[in-house]
């Protein structure tokens, strides 16, 4: 018998119950005892194995994006951008690439309602012919912080109080009162789009600035945007309470039901590009993840479409064990010097090794679908079949070679080692622009939400004043409305 034929898969299920080792089990409802009412015997191997397996079913929860659901489909290029990038999966219109997408909430735990006011994750894994490309984004184009060293703190502030295990806005507002750069993200999170109706009716963004490299070697900064073809729909605060009270998995069910009925969710992919030579022409730093790029100056360019036409086969295997990492890029797409992106390149791989083990990229849902080869051997839960005798490089006995050099940005740097804040902060302009772009009733809902959280009893007069000052600098009328309703004078 070929021992590799019956690899772990439900496709090879026996017609009868067995142990993990394959031995037949004749009774799966009674423990082995001495007599009818005697003590249970330790020699009941099946009992011990069954219970031990059960008590180890849960793996560490994601520290963020714990609540999520995945679906599979394809990405198809619809517009030629081969002049902008040499990425193989973007080489020509009509090219299709298999994908898996994970949608999630960010802050709350694995079993939390999907109606919480929170950022949503929008992560896409492209299984390309040149390896996996993970575009790990959100439904907001910006984030609260611009430097990865602050990431543990912002998550700690957003997460529940470590003493009470209750999420409390006095903690969040205390921490972020030190971060005026967070204002633009609040203009998404506390706007109407802060509670999407479901995952099908929300936008997605790559958030960070990446780089595209053309065959000629020309480099462009790029931002990625996903636009749902069925439009954007949100829940009001009142609707969210009703929907979440009736079904805490409403968005998961909506996604599953839509795909099962043939109503496949679809998004269009657009990009914005910028010549690095032009980065000093703006009143903000293009690598600052707390800022958006103005679309009137850097217009959206269509690239392709994302279609989800298959539900997952198993939640644990294809959602819980699905692992994303912004460090996974392919030739033609590279990182930028965005400080938060640089940190995520390490942090995401590190958290997956903690959750799933050092060989998490061998799991079927994470493994590349193209041929691959390296000498990363052994480690916990390594199940890759290998029969090589050479596990080092170079060798006269192994003909493997390094691949041809792929194009990457050739930046040159000068300067001293330093820890500093970027010079072009400009923390208030874009937040004010977004607020003023809304209709009056939408502005009123935003103000109402801020009045509510700024009324937290444990929030100090000083912190309230700081926030009113921030919003006043973004838009004078907004600050005045908050000050009037809270009976607080702004202070800096």
UniProtKB/Swiss-Prot annotation:
Metal-binding recorded as keyword: yes
Catalytic activity, EC: 1.11.1.6
Residues at the active site: 65, 138
Compartments reported by the entry: Peroxisome
Catalytic reaction equation(s): 2 H2O2 = O2 + 2 H2O
Keyword check for Oxidoreductase: yes
GO CC terms, sorted: apoplast; chloroplast; chloroplast envelope; chloroplast stroma; cytosol; cytosolic ribosome; mitochondrion; nucleus
Residues holding heme: 348
A molecular function (GO) term: catalase activity
GO BP: cellular response to nitrogen starvation; cellular response to phosphate starvation; cellular response to sulfate starvation; hydrogen peroxide catabolic process; peptidyl-cysteine S-trans-nitrosylation; response to cold; response to light stimulus; response to oxidative stress
Cofactor: heme
Keywords, in A-Z order: Heme, Hydrogen peroxide, Iron, Metal-binding, Oxidoreductase, Peroxidase, Peroxisome
Gene3D superfamilies named among the record's database cross-references: Catalase core domain (2.40.180.10)
Subunit composition and interactions: Homotetramer and heterotetramer. At least six or seven isozymes are produced from a mixture of 3 gene products. Interacts with NCA1. Interacts with LSD1.
Family classification: Belongs to the catalase family.
Biological role stated in the UniProt entry: Occurs in almost all aerobically respiring organisms and serves to protect cells from the toxic effects of hydrogen peroxide.
PANTHER family: CATALASE, CATALASE-3
Listed name of the protein: Catalase-3
